[in-house]
């Protein structure tokens, strides 16, 4: 059994001065939520083996704050393709890690996370709000 946690970045600051969407930072609410979700996973004993984050500032900061808030020892890496990546891209990314890790956390964006969750679980489209998480367990051979 392998598990994937999809973690949408915290609330971002639309009023901040930044170079483009990729560089948009978290706002104070997003910072607080990222830390809270990191602690939540820790209290549930669900700390992933690896965290793979989008390179977008708001996602990368979310991942780092979650990890720091509860002293996760997870491996951390950035993956530019998560930003704007299709559900198929996310599946391929997960597939490349299946022999290395039992659990992983992807930190990224909408609408690709909602689409991926819907496809992976066979459910209708879901609304995946900021700083939200979904865990999916996969049977692998």
Regions found by a protein language model. Give the residues of each.
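Active-site-proximal alpha-helix that buttresses catalytic centers in soluble enzyme cores
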Residues: 2-3, 7-81, 85, 113, ...
């Amino acid at each position: 059994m392998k598990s994937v946690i999809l973690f949408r970045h915290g609330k971002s600051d639309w009023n901040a001065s930044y170079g483009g969407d990729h560089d948009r930072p978290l706002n104070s609410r997003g910072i607080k939520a990222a830390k809270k979700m990191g602690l939540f996973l820790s209290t549930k004993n669900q700390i992933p083996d690896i965290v793979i984050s989008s390179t977008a500032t708001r996602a990368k900061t979310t991942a780092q704050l979650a990890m720091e808030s509860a002293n996760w020892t997870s491996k951390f890496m950035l993956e530019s393709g998560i930003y704007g990546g299709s559900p198929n891209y996310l599946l391929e990314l997960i597939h490349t890690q299946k022999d290395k890790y039992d659990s992983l956390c992807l930190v990224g964006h909408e609408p690709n996370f909602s689409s991926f969750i819907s496809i992976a679980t066979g459910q209708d489209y879901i609304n995946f709000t900021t700083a939200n998480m979904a865990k999916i367990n996969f049977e692998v051979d």
